Amino acid sequence: MPPIPPPTREGVTTTTPVPLHWCRYTPTAPRSGLVVLHGGPGAHHEYLLPQLLFLAEARDCLLYDQRGGGRSKTDDRTPITWHTHVDDLTAVLAECAPGPLTLVGYSWGALLALLYTLEASAGRAGPMPARLVLLDPAPASRAFRATFEAEFARRQAGPEVQALRAALDASGLRERDPAAYRQRTFELSVAGYFADPDRARDLTPFRVTGRVQQSTWESLGDFDLLPALRTLRVPALVVHGRQDPIPLASAAAVAEALGARTCWLDDCGHVPYVEQPAALREAVTRFLDDTEGLVTG
């Protein structure tokens, strides 16, 4: 795994109820700006790196740890909801990324981008995005989420992952090298997200704050974003791996509702920036280049 380069700048927000850690990667002459939303909820931005830093080769990229995860943890036990995340994003944009808005969301971050856009369209958030890049978006409805949960559980309990777990248990690695054992344990915990479980070794490790994840999903209730998404008029790209445990049908329904450009990746699960980085880069770069006039005027 290549090291994560230091950001151009970093700090914490001063306008959110809880200070949120942010960082930005800025090229010498950025064409425009992107706000990148990590998955989870309850995770942090670093597991998107270093692979997604191709986004910062031509554009300023702002990333932040959403409330309750990473370096934005809080001792406040007030439940964090999807409204919390949308309100935080609104404040982060006003403080750190004023001007024409491009949201790049991965997994839960893509769903957050959609929730924010719906709220913005109703006048309950900040500015409307000029464009959206949605990478392997989280399920767009409770029904699609149930399908994902069942498929991920099936993969994790399947013979391939179970054989890898048995090999780890028999290896003696826990005693010989506890750090390597923890790394391998992490890899096996996310193996079901990948088309090839061995590729999990190339993902930067991360932790999810369970209470944040639980309270956020619970706050969505029996959700279905698709009818509301059909009312939006925003240029978008939806990228999804064909072997993602999140149903391709969910991503396709989001794309249909938005009238979005699509890119379905073969031999790819939920982590395209690890599994198919070249194809991902080509699709995202082409979309951003084609729509640059929307943010540069």
Segments the model singles out, each with a brief description of its role:
Residues 165-219:
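Conserved alpha/beta-hydrolase catalytic His-Asp/Glu region
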